[in-house]
């Protein structure tokens, strides 16, 4: 199984959108059993909050299903050992990510 984790600042917009877009692609290709896809934040600001209304609206516009129970979580050091791919949404998140996970990233 390929495990993918998308990372942004708050885990309510970009990383969440990337998570649901990739899940939709994988579902349409009938490959759900081959992937585990999630998203997380580098900050604690939005922890526990749901997906941003703008993100929900855009995903709805392009008919991408959203798990409305999704809540923002923060990446942990342990995630580095769980996921095959950790994808930061921009340079700032990559920099912050390097403070959280091991040196060899």
Model-based region annotation:
Residues 1-82:
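Conserved active-site segments centered on acidic
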Residues 60, 74-105:
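Glycine/proline-rich loop-helix segments at beta-alpha junctions forming the active-site rim
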């Amino acid at each position: 199984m390929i495990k993918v984790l998308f990372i942004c600042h708050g885990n309510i917009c970009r990383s969440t959108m990337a998570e649901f877009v990739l899940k939709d692609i994988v579902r349409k290709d009938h490959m759900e059993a081959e992937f585990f896809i999630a998203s997380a934040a580098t900050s604690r600001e939005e922890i526990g909050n749901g997906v941003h209304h703008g993100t929900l609206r855009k995903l709805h516009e392009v008919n991408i299903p959203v798990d409305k129970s999704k809540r923002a979580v923060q990446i942990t050091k342990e995630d580095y050992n769980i996921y095959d791919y950790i994808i930061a949404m921009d340079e700032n998140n990559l920099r912050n990510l390097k403070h959280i996970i091991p040196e060899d990233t």
